[in-house]
Amino acid sequence: MLVKTYCAAVMGLEAITVTIEVSMTQGVMFHLTGLADTAVKESHDRIRSALANIGYRFPVADITINMAPADVKKEGSSYDLPLAIGILAANGKIADGQLSDYMIVGEVGLDGSLQPIRGALPIAIKARADKFKGLIVPRQNVREAAVVNNLQVYGMDSLVDVINFFNGSLDYQPTIIDTRKEFFEHQYHFDYDFADVKGQESVKRALEVAAAGGHNLIMIGPPGSGKSMMAKRLPSILPPLSLAESLETTQIHSVAGKLGKDMSLIFQRPFRAPHHTISQVGLAGGSNKAMPGEVSLAHNGVLFLDELTEFNRATLEILRQPLEDRKITITRALYTVEYPCSLMLVASMNPCPCGYYGDPLHTCTCTPGQISRYLSKISGPLLDRIDIHCEIQAVPFSELSKMQPGEPSEQIRERVIAARKRQEERFKPYKGIHCNAMMTERMLHEFAEPDTASLDMLRMAMERLKLSARAYSRILKVARTIADLAGSEKVESVHIAEAIGYRNLDRGDWAERGC
């Protein structure tokens, strides 16, 4: 008897429908074909044990299973459930009349329980695209899959539940989620607020400019000055995710297995803060399954690299291409996947090895040579890709105790959203361009061309600071954002002056002043 079940292979953010053909004839052999990896081949043992523990006997027959298309690599344990259902149907234990209506995925435990899988959301999107009536997933994955409309998604706890579902023994109801309602209810729930930050007005301003234009930013200051504290509050002033952005971000986290069992969509912009010991694969993505790395998990959000100079230099250099292209390609022997990584890079670092270079409250013990070597850990090309360099000093306790609470994030966010709306209107004719940080050179000439006085000021700064052509473009992009925050149609000298002030690390006197 020949039976077919349907599941999916996840490759990057896409899913490919896989047809499982189970043929059962007289004999005692078990054959599995179709480019299956070790985990798929081991499913035979898991299924045998699961069937025994729920009261079914594994068929004594010659079982041949083909997983098509044969040229697509089948990886992981998500094929356990469709394989088990196919074997039971071929053995006459399950009515096969509805099998063609449903896509089935899930890992089967030795006791017959269903365990969560990665990539349930891309699989659900593919199931709807291929006109399947419904999708059967483990209970832990049901909410993330149920965000796909016009698809009946059933969350099951065990293999017994799936058997009863197809045999009609019990009446199961699909999980239904009001995606839009949940999305808009959770958009503005933040754990941190800028109202908690006293002082540091210049740093808050730099973060506001960065948020308004989507600019990369680095904060340089001594220990305890509040660099990490303010970075954690940056998502609270960013524009809210659109529903399309939320869906794309959730897909990435679904593929990486980062969604909890009660999560449906990611409602807020991601904030990823990997430790400085992270590997190149952990940051960029990869491994044998081409999983997304931190740069992709931060897509549509913030990647925060605390203590930037402590990261391995080779690891940091990986960021150069993703920051420029806003996507990253991972190539393996049999396939290539591409993940989006349109993110804001926010970094922090001490100004020198001891941490107190330029600090009025402490004495720096570093020599100019030590400071120069310390700063050289960050390459020029990477630094050129960071639009805003912001110095930060610790606020003395005597002043801190007298200060009033800071401006709430909500008020800052309103200004940021207003500036972003101006940019969205400006870039409507340009596909894929949403904010000033994404502008091309041609757009700079059209939208950020400085007047004569501003151009003279910029030329003088370029000569004195020995800035690169890329740094010149960054200054114009930041100036355009400052103008948007001010509601100005033109980039004026005051905007250029502030933007030049955000190129602190380009100054040649860093290793010579203050010690």
Where is each model-derived feature located?
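The Walker A (P-loop) glycine that initiates the GxxxxGKT/S ATP-binding motif of P-loop NTPases
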Residues: 221, 285, 307
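Conserved inter-motif catalytic segment of the P-loop NTP-binding fold
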Residues: 245-279, 286-287, 393, 434-442, ...
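Walker B catalytic acidic pair
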Residues: 300, 306-307, 318
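Peripheral, non-AAA+ core regions of ATP-driven protein-machinery
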Residues: 1-218, 222-228, 331, 471-472, ...
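Conserved alpha-helical scaffold flanking the Walker A/P-loop in AAA+ ATPase domains
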Residues: 208, 265, 270, 280-303, ...
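Walker A/P-loop
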Residues: 219-260
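Short beta-strand elements
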Residues: 18-24, 283, 387-390
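Basic, amphipathic alpha-helical bundle interface domains used for macromolecular binding and assembly
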Residues: 33-44, 59, 66-76, 290, ...
